[in-house]
C-alpha cells in the first residue's frame, strides 16, 4: 500500500458528522492512481447534518440519484460536481441517516509533483486550498463515488493531531436560512492551506 499507514477503521466514521468533521482534521487523505500516489493532511472540513440541515443535499430526507449514497453506511465516498469542480465528502453516522463531511482543504504531503502537474502554474499553496482544488490536485473524481474510504484507491489514515481547531459558519450556503450560521466548518488554526 502506497500510503504511510493503514486506513482508519469503519468505526471511526460511525458518528454524527459534527463529531466526525473535527476529528478528520490532521488525518492523511490518500489517493492512488496509475500516475502515482498523492496525499495531503486534511486541514478544513464542513459537517452536513442531513434531514434537519437546510444546507445539506439530503435536507428533508431528499433522496435522489445524486444523494443516494448519503443514506448508505458510514465511510462511503460521496462525490458530486458543482461549477465543473468535483467535491468530495465522507458519509457519516449510520444507514438511513444521510449525514456527510465535506473535505474542504488539505496540506500537500506525498506526490507533490503530481499535484503540480494537475494544477500547473499555481503556487503550491493554491494546489489544495479549496474543495474543488484538492480533488483536482489529488486525482479524485466522480469515479470515486460510492467507494469505501477504508480501502484503496481513496482512503484516510492517521496523520497529526492539530494543536488548535477553529470553527465558524460554512461557506457558500447563503440560501439555506438559519443553517448558514451554524458553526459547522472546522479548520486547523493558522494553517496556510485553509481556504479562507
From Swiss-Prot:
GO terms for molecular function: alkylbase DNA N-glycosylase activity; DNA binding. Keywords: DNA damage, DNA repair, Hydrolase. It is an enzyme of class 3 (hydrolase). Gene3D superfamilies: Methylpurine-DNA glycosylase (MPG). One of its GO terms (biological process) is base-excision repair. Coiled coil: none annotated. The keyword DNA repair applies. It comes from the Bacteria. Its EC number is 3.2.2.-. Belongs to the DNA glycosylase MPG family. NCBIfam families: 3mg, PRK00802.1-2. HAMAP family: 3MGH. This is Putative 3-methyladenine DNA glycosylase.
Amino acid at each position: 500500500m502506497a500510503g504511510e499507514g493503514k486506513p482508519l477503521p469503519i468505526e471511526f466514521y460511525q458518528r454524527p458528522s459534527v463529531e466526525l468533521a473535527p476529528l478528520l482534521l490532521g488525518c492523511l487523505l490518500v489517493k492512488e492512481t496509475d500516475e502515482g500516489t498523492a496525499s495531503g493532511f486534511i486541514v478544513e472540513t464542513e459537517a452536513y447534518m442531513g434531514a434537519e440541515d437546510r444546507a445539506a443535499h439530503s435536507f428533508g430526507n431528499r433522496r435522489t440519484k445524486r444523494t443516494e449514497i448519503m443514506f448508505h453506511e458510514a465511510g462511503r465516498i460521496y462525490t458530486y460536481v458543482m461549477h465543473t469542480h468535483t467535491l468530495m465528502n465522507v458519509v457519516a453516522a449510520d444507514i438511513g441517516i444521510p449525514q456527510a463531511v465535506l473535505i474542504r482543504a488539505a496540506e500537500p504531503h506525498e506526490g507533490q509533483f503530481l499535484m503540480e502537474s494537475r494544477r500547473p502554474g499555481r503556487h503550491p499553496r493554491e494546489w489544495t486550498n479549496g474543495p474543488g482544488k484538492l480533488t483536482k490536485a489529488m486525482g479524485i473524481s466522480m469515479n470515486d463515488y460510492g467507494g469505501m474510504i477504508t480501502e484503496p484507491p481513496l482512503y484516510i489514515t492517521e496523520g497529526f493531531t492539530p494543536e488548535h481547531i477553529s470553527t465558524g459558519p460554512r461557506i457558500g450556503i447563503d440560501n439555506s436560512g438559519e443553517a448558514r450560521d451554524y458553526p459547522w466548518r472546522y479548520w486547523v488554526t493558522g494553517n496556510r492551506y485553509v481556504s479562507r
